[in-house]
Curated annotation (Swiss-Prot):
HAMAP family: COQ7. It catalyses: a 5-methoxy-2-methyl-3-(all-trans-polyprenyl)benzene-1,4-diol + AH2 + O2 = a 3-demethylubiquinol + A + H2O. Keywords: Cell membrane, Iron, Membrane, Metal-binding, Monooxygenase, Oxidoreductase, Ubiquinone biosynthesis. It comes from Delftia acidovorans (strain DSM 14801 / SPH-1). The gene is coq7. The lineage of its organism: Bacteria, Pseudomonadati, Pseudomonadota, Betaproteobacteria, Burkholderiales. This is 3-demethoxyubiquinol 3-hydroxylase. It is an enzyme of class 1 (oxidoreductase). GO terms for cellular component: plasma membrane.
Amino acid sequence: MDKILTAADAALRTLFAQPSAAERSPAAGIAEGELTEAQRRLSGALMRVNHVGEVCAQALYNAQAMVTRDMVLREHLLEAAREETDHLAWTRDRLNALGDRPSLLNPLWFAGAFAIGVVAAKISDAASLGFVVETEEQVSAHLESHLGLLPEEDRASLAVVARMKDDEERHAAAAREAGALQLPPPARALMRLAAKVMTTTAHRI
């Protein structure tokens, strides 16, 4: 019951509360750039996509933590979720600064990622960690692409994305060291397809 309550609390905080970061945002102290309206809309759309990614990360980690019976792994997953909360707050702050909003479909994205996390964790802890590795690697690659898409004048968003990319790579490495199982190619391809649908939709909605 405690695990279920923890997961429910995480869902409510992720979807409906203003997230609070434990660590100072990489954008702190960086002056807002002079953006054209088109650049502002582009930055807002890209940061909305990144915010959705962090919503999904919260769902994935908390679902896996709810299911696993390995208390060491559970604490590892919850710690990763706490670190991802910083990303959630940073991306939300950038959306606010850019005059944009989170995706209206965040509850749907959260539910889908939570379901994937539960299924993966029920297969095995190694499979669960394999999903973490694949997710973090895909997110890292996505963030890398955003570094080339964001307007160079938006130095605050660029700083946030660069730091997030470093953190995601560290999370993937930690999951591999914890015994992650490499996912079969069909599973990785399906995850890439789902990510494509999510990012394309979140860019607009």
